[in-house]
Amino acid sequence: MPSYVTRQKTRQTFSWVGRPLPNRKQFYQMYKEICMKINGCSEIHIKVGQFVLIQGEDNQKPYVAKLIELFENGSEVPPKKYARVQWFVRFCEIPIPKRHLLGRRPSAQEIFWYDCSDCDNDIHVETIIGPVQVVALAPEDEIPVNQKSEETLFVKLSWNKKNFAPLPPEELAALRRLECQKPLEAKTKSVKSPSWSTAEQEVKRIESSHSTSRSYQDPAHTVTPNAMKSLECGGFTRKPNMRLSRKILCDSLDSQKTCKRRAAFSETTSPPKKPQPGEIKTSSALETLGKNGHTQPFFAKSSMVLRTRGTAVKTTKLTVESALSPVRSRSRYSVAPSVGLTPQYIGRKAKEQETHKEPIHTSLRARRRSSLLTLKRIKQQLWLLDDDKSDQEEEESISSVEVSDSSSEEEDESVPSPPTGKPVGQSRTRRTASKPSSQTPSKSPKKTFRPRPPLHATPQIRDRNLAVQEPASVLEEARLRLHVSAVPDSLPCREQEFQDIYSFVESKLLDGTGGCMYISGVPGTGKTATVHEVIRCLQQAAQTNDVPPFEYVEVNGMKLTEPHQVYVQILQKLTGQKATANHAAELLAKQFCSRGSQKETTVLLVDELDLLWTHKQDVLYNLFDWPTHKGARLVVLTIANTMDLPERIMMNRVASRLGLTRMSFQPYSHSQLKQILVSRLKHLKAFEDDAVQLVARKVAALSGDARRCLDICRRATEICEVSHQRGDSQCLVTVAHLMEAIDEMFSSSYITAIKNSSVLEQSFLRAIIAEFRRSGLEEATFQQIYSQHVALCRMEGLPYPTMSETMAVCSRLGSCRILLVEPSRNDLLLRVRLNVSQNDVLYALKEE
């Protein structure tokens, strides 16, 4: 879509047209038409039933709606102007998970009838940007692609938040009746801008001077006697210093851009002249004079020549066509060359015979720009052609244009003309006709074209070549079921918490309001799993119309590099766009805090909330503040491990916005852990009953962490499988296997490292403890410890090591982080400390 008026800082004023139609029941005054004045220059009359553009979050893609009513609320002081609309939605406004339901690639100009009544249909009149043309099509029709329909929108389907459907017959008929009415331009009354009127006065002054003044001949151009005679009768005359200033010309060009482009290349009365090989033609028109005397704006992107029709003057029959060609000033210090209008005279006979022609030299930069524009348009046309053979012909024409970009004839003929009812084959015939007829066939084989990659490739995960292997044994099946990521059929022992969270979110969805809930509990108590189960059940209920549809977004504080990145993650998952943290926070605040901006409720799950804490606590404040706004459809579910997190680290203004809706997940008891294990191992005999009872009681006494319990059982199956392969036990997890797994799980890594250390390393640790007890300090030098080490070796009858060997032992224990040592350059004065308690060292060194 092109840029709209909202990008320019325009001043719009609105006024009613006609008499009001009072509504005594609602104290409203209804109107049928409103006048919108832009910058005091142009007036646009908009009636009920027309389609309008409405200001939105993105200026490039404003909202589209149909006017249903125009009214003024008399109860307000001062009275405000309102409009009731029927919304349309663009494809980018549809939630990302549901865009695949369309089943095809949408057009950039396609919109959808919004068939849902849960949004606010009353808007302020000041938010209207202007009218827009909307064309209704049948579902099987194709959207036309041409220059004339750039600012036209097309509607084929409707969207009801669940799927796409064809337009209702009555709505389709109503939309097509609107198309048969008076076109949009007839309702727009434009006031001439000063710049354009100045240009018109200048042209009229030039016309009036033809009959009285002598024609001035430019030395660069030659005029035949016939042309001179015609000029004396009433043709255009050029005076020496008569030039339109660059400012007047640019202002006239800018004022024309606001009007709709109606003219086309086919509007010229005479056939286009064919340039000679050495001539470069840059064709355009500033204005085309019709038979009625009115000016019609006409632009082309690569335009430079200004033409007028021969039928512009009624009173005089001219035999000479006048063309205004630009004359660039040769000023050396000007930033941009000023353009003057020079009448250029071309006789009809000379035009038909193509004998009197003057080459117009253009700069290399302008030629390069025109060539690139030609290539761009040809490539766009190539994508629209489905025939492979025609594609190859177009690519050959592209290569010919690239080689000879200095020839403007090929550029002019290669540009696809605007739609004038001619088939595509005619333009292809013209291009092939311009080539020499006698060509020697190339002996070398044609260049083979590589297959093009798809225009819009969809990234996807690679398919699995081999099927997933089935578990080979009972123990392997048990390990799969006991994995933390395995989703069980149900969540036992959390029925009450599930019901409370479900009721809270369901009530907010039904009421269309926002809220916040704080969920706390120690790790492994099922907080995240319970919330996921609630969301899954609510999504199933939304598919059966039991609850309104909603959008679900989940962020985890552990996956963020910085707390403010939570804004970026939320915005990307909601809209699919990327932005900086500050800009994303502004967009989210505008979406959640403005009334009527949301059409669906958003459920936001924030896991590991305590990791989003900052010094100013602005992230937590915004997350808790957004649901409190009036009309904000945002439900925030926060999860943290600390029960008193709001009172301990949050400010009062942040904790107050959190609300009183809190829930605490208590640690699992031994009976609950046993029930969880039994439900996972349902119909699978892999554990002894006593083993399950033992691991449940052990874990419940320590932490009540269900994840730790599942990990211990999985490790026990691995130990059992290894012992079964050696033939030591049967394929059943016993109490001994579980005790071994529990010892591995709950024992410290430092204790395990000390137990597995060498005799010399264990002797050095005993020497450290002996020196600490002797000195009464928790720190000693390497020289003092070495003396104790030598004494202990003599008492035990062991050969004592050298100083270098003892230094190597100390460095190894320091690398294992069992000791805290200084750099070895201190040598004998190296200070040594224990990184674990003395009791743990003595426990690891005791003889069993």
Curated annotation (Swiss-Prot):
Ranges for region Necessary and sufficient for ORC complex assembly: 488-848
Residues carrying Phosphoserine: S193, S252, S270, S284, S325, S404, S407
Extent of Acidic residues compositional bias: 388-397
Binding sites annotated in the UniProt record for ATP: V487, G521, V522, P523, G524, T525, G526, K527, T528, A529, E608, N641, R707
Modified residues (N6-acetyllysine): K314
Site positions (Histone H4K20me2 binding): E93
SMART domains: AAA, BAH, Cdc6_C
Record-listed Mg(2+) binding positions: D607, E608
Annotated spans, Disordered: 189-227, 261-280, 344-365, 388-466
Post-translational modification: Phosphorylated during mitosis.
Biased composition (Polar residues): 191-200
Amino acid composition bias (Basic and acidic residues), ranges on this chain: 349-360
Alphabetical UniProt keywords: Acetylation, ATP-binding, DNA replication, DNA-binding, Magnesium, Metal-binding, Nucleotide-binding, Nucleus, Phosphoprotein
Subunit comment: Component of ORC, a complex composed of at least 6 subunits: ORC1, ORC2, ORC3, ORC4, ORC5 and ORC6. ORC is regulated in a cell-cycle dependent manner. It is sequentially assembled at the exit from anaphase of mitosis and disassembled as cells enter S phase. Interacts with CDC6 and KAT7/HBO1. Interacts with LRWD1 predominantly during the G1 phase and with less affinity during mitosis, when phosphorylated.
The name this protein goes by in its record: Origin recognition complex subunit 1
Species per Swiss-Prot/TrEMBL record: Rattus norvegicus
